[in-house]
Amino acid sequence: MKKWCFLLYVCILSIWLVSCGVGDLSDKESDPEELQSSESAIKGTNYVMATCTNKKCVVLYDLDLYDGENLDNCEIWSFAPASTEAYEGGGGISGVKYREDTVFGDVVIVCAGNGYAAIVSYPDGETLWETLDSGSNSHAIEILPSGNVAVAASSGDTLRLFASSAVLQNDTEKASVYKEYFLKDGHGVLWDPEYKVLWAVGQEDLNAYTVAGEGSDEELILRDDLGTLKPGLYGHDLSADFLDANYLWVTGGSHVYHFNKETGELSLDYEFGDKLDKPSVKGFGNNPDGSYFLTMPNYGVGTSWEKESYAGWSTDKIFCFYPGEDGAELETVKCKSETRAFYKVFSFYGKYQ
């Protein structure tokens, strides 16, 4: 009798476990919508985010899905402003970052050449803050630990700091207010949690700014003891080195530089420089797993958009570099899209450093 009771108990327990979804999940299909909002999607190390000039949007790719044919099949998330007003006067999205922000939560921050900038919640895509006054030909955006946003713009030679955090107190008027600083041909901006400074790169300056004040009273103070001046740099992109917190990556007109924060040196003597150092790189970065990625214009040769005005700074390929088994070599993978014209590419690692 006890034996039969035990067997009955086992059967009931098995049925309950299956009904609760516990058991063999090897053949269970994943819901794409669940994938976009899952922890693995947020933390994925082989994810990159790119700005698309022809579609005027940003796209998130899972490069593990790349089959060597069409990068479009790897798209798992995208964002484009709901209002066409965001694109009046032209200019696609030129800057984007993903941040695990302590003020707004997980966000994607974007800026566009016509002055549009926004904080967008991830993964639901809700616009939390936006402006059409980020600067003339805005190129890069960063969100500070305070929730305020900094935008570098090239044609206007500006670095603007917005009191965007005020929107959380429903003060939209104050959230649109900004302080402006001169930055010749502003192209890149990046917060550094180690040095507690905002880095910004322009035509020949790589500057570091201390943030003083709080909330809408925050302001930037230039540090004379950090940064560097390099005539002919033509700085373009600025990103963290996720393998060494003492370095930044800086792309220029002719090279990809490794910047030593402590010494202020822009160096071309770095590991894998024979593959990574290229001219006219628009977007560059790495991931904590040791992979690298970049975009550089190929003028859309052979694409449907090669005669468009933006072809001169766009490409249909994202170059990815993966460490070999011994770590001594980098494998190059050219991820090609059949429909997208890319400008910049960014790491989807949500930490600042």
What are the language-model segments listed below?
Residues K43-G44, E100-F104, L144-S146, P193-Y195, ...:
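Residue-level detector of Asp-centered blade-edge/turn motifs that repeat once per structural unit
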Residues C74-A118, G125-A140:
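Blade-loop segments of beta-propeller domains
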Residues D72-Y87, E126-L132, E173-Y181, I221-L229, ...:
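A short beta-strand motif characteristic of beta-propeller blades
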Residues I15-I42:
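Bacterial Sec-dependent N-terminal signal peptides
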Residues A86-R99, G135-I143, L183-L190, P231-D241, ...:
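Repeated scaffold domains used in trafficking and secretory/extracellular systems
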Residues D62-E69, A163-N170, T210-E219, N260-L268:
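Short loop/turn segments immediately following beta-strands, especially the blade-tip
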Residues L8-W16:
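Bacterial N-terminal signal peptides
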Residues A50-N54, I109-N114, A150-S155, L198-E204, ...:
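Conserved beta-strand positions in repeat-built beta-propeller and related beta-rich domains
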